[in-house]
């Protein structure tokens, strides 16, 4: 089938019907909580509910949903045609010329106040994900409650709780994203040599993986961002890996370097996550000891995930194993994992203080790490989906040491 003849159902993205069902869930939630209108400012939350993906800037965008089922939006003029191309039909809208005013003499949130007035929401119960637009790219603005001169119930959980359990369509997109994250990692691993430049190998593999993705998927692939590539891989090396989020360093790969990698795909706006610990040349006894400990801890994390347990209970299993069986609790720097989907990190978290109940359809990273100061970090991360009885890995790259040795 030629790209020109592809129907929207063939494209790798969430369809209009699912976006409509998401908004209907919000309408019911508003009615149950006796909330008259909800203002959604977070760009990812706007996209989740409307299908409108955009590049967030200093110009506020807000989606407004009302308990009686109306959909409206605050938009800068420069995004109007973009919203019309992607988003649902609106019952009302407020367009402003520019930020901070574009000659209108009015802050954009005053246009939102006018919109809420037309919707009959002023003076009634209004909620929002956050109390006003986030401060990015030089934006300055008042809280929504100050503009409206009334309380606003601000709660990110109103939308983010709905995002925790993924639909079949979301899981399919993330499964495809995992496939391309795995592919990017393979290209990168196969390109690493002693003397390789860390940055050049990382970016070269990402570009080649993206070329492969576009060649295979063609018009089925629908980009959802202005920045970044659909398939990505990177690594850091040596003692820098002892920092869980160490930055890139200039220089070349050397014999004996420990490598901690990261790779992911993005399909339909949904991400994957894959990380591996590798070694350049033959691993010595010290490396093998920590690698085996990390691998065992990750397996405990896999085994801990099943419906009905809490995130804290799963994390407790991992931390208990690292403390009591490995005697390495002092090498832990972070929790075992996190949810994700449209964002690289999403609620909930596999953390001792997150008591969210695990449900089928949730997607997590599982990535307990051990960090040995001035030596190296040891961390695998895999994308998993919760099933009715446990979990299933979506990232399929080998976890075993024999497959993660780079020839010296």
Regions found by a protein language model. Name each.
Residues 1-408:
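Active-site neighborhoods and metal-handling regions in enzymes and metal-associated proteins
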